[in-house]
C-alpha cells in the first residue's frame, strides 16, 4: 500500500488506502475528501493503444478499447505493448483478493484537475474536476500496469503516466474518450518525469542511471542525455526553462543544463536519495531542494541552491533534519513555507509527523492538538481491521552487482593450494 502527500497551493493533499484528503495549511482543517468508488468499473475493459496504431482506429472510447499494438517491429510484425489490466476485488481480505488503493495524486498546473492513479486489484487513472465542484469524477481509464510517475502539461490539457516497465503514455484531459498515446519507453522503471513549460521536451529518469530529454511531439527523437549518475535517479525538478535538478542513489544532488546535456553542479549527499522536492524562493535564482535519504541517521536534507549571473550554481546552505529517523519507517514528505510534513509506518500503521522547517524540530505551535489523529482517522488508518501499512522496500532500487573476479581468484587460490599439497604428498 502506498501513501502520497503533496503541497499544491493552497492545500496539502494526502492519499492513503481508498481516500484522498485536502487540508488547509493555515488552519489545518480538512475541507474536502475523495473516496474511491467501490468498483472502478474496469471489468472487461482493456487498456487502450496508441492513437497511431492502425488497430486503434476502431477504438473510439475507453469502454470499447482492447489491448493492441502501438508500433511494428522492423520485419513488419506488430508489437503488443499493452495488456489486459489485472482484475481483482476491492477489499483487503484474506481470500487472496488484492485491494485497490490510491498510488499517486497530482494537481494540474491550473488547479482545476486532479489525476489519481490506483494500484492493486484495479489499476486505473481517475480524472477529477477539483474546483469549483467538490471533486467531481470526470473519467476512469484502465492502466495496463501500475503507474510510477504522473505529470500534467503546462496548459493542463493532457497528463503523462509512466509505468513500472518504463512506458510513458499521454492521456487527453479535454477529449476524455480519446485513446492514450504511447510516447516513449525505457528499458527499466521510470521514477520521475517532467514536461517543460513550452511543452517542447519530456524529461525522464530511470533505474539505469539515465536522464533522458525527449523532443515533443516528435518523441521518436531524443534531444539529449544528462549522464553521470552511477545509481538510480530517483527524482527530478524543473528549475528554469533550461535547468533541472536531480537526486540519485549514488549520494549526489546535481544541476544540469538539460538542453545541452551538461552537468553544472554536483553536490555530495550523506546517503542515497530516494525523494526530491524543490521550492522556488526567488524566481530562477534561489531554490530550496529537499531530499529524503535512504536509511540514514538524518532522514531529510534541505539545500539552498543559488544561481549566479554567469550561470554558476552552488549550494550555499545545508540543513539536516533527523525527523526521528530510526524510530519509524519514513516513506514520503512534503514542504510548505514553514513546515515539513512526513509520513511513514510505525508498528505497521500509518503515521504522520510535522516539523518546523526553520529548526528541523517537531512543530510545537500552529498544529492543533489531536490534528494528526483527525487526519489518520480521515484516511481510515485507525479503523479496526485496516490492512497493515508496510512502505515499499527501496532496497530493490539499487543495482545488484556480482563480483565474478573475486570468485575466480578464490577458486584459483584453492586450486594452487591443492596442487602444492599433491606435490608435497
Swiss-Prot record:
Residue ranges of the region described as Disordered: 67-102
Q: In which pathway does it act?
A: tRNA modification; N(7)-methylguanine-tRNA biosynthesis
Summed up, the tissue specificity of this protein is: In testis, it is present at high level in hub cells, a niche for germline stem cells of testis. Ubiquitously expressed in all testicular cells throughout spermatogenesis. Ubiquitously expressed in all germline and somatic cells of the ovary.
- Repeats (WD): which ranges? 97-138, 142-181, 185-224, 228-266, 325-365
Query: HAMAP family under this entry?
Result: TRM82
This chain's function reads:
Required for the Mettl1-dependent formation of N(7)-methylguanine at position 46 (m7G46) in tRNA. In the Mettl1-wuho methyltransferase complex, it is required to stabilize and induce conformational changes of the catalytic subunit. Required for binding of nanos mRNA and repression of translation by the mei-P26-bgcn-bam-sxl complex. May cooperate with mei-P26 and nanos to derepress the BMP signaling pathway. May cooperate with mei-P26 to suppress expression of a subset of microRNAs. May cooperate with mei-P26 to regulate bam expression levels in germline cells during gametogenesis.
Subcellular localization: Nucleus; Cytoplasm
| Record key words, sorted | Cytoplasm, Developmental protein, Differentiation, Nucleus, Oogenesis, Repeat, Spermatogenesis, tRNA processing, WD repeat
Name by which UniProt lists this protein: tRNA (guanine-N(7)-)-methyltransferase non-catalytic subunit wuho
Extract the PANTHER family matched here. Answer: TRNA (GUANINE-N(7)-)-METHYLTRANSFERASE NON-CATALYTIC SUBUNIT WDR4 (PTHR16288:SF0), WD40 REPEAT PROTEIN 4 (PTHR16288)
Pfam families named among the record's database cross-references: WD40 (PF00400)
Which segment of the chain is annotated as a signal peptide?
none
Assembly, per entry: Forms a heterodimer with the catalytic subunit Mettl1. Interacts with mei-P26 and weakly interacts with bgcn; required for the function or formation of the mei-P26-bgcn-bam-sxl complex. Interacts with nanos; may be involved in mei-P26-dependent derepression of the BMP signaling pathway. Interacts with Myc; the interaction may be mediated by mei-P26 and may be involved in the regulation of ribosome biogenesis.
Miscellaneous note, as given in the UniProt record, is: Wuho means 'no progeny' in Chinese.
**Primary gene name:** wuho
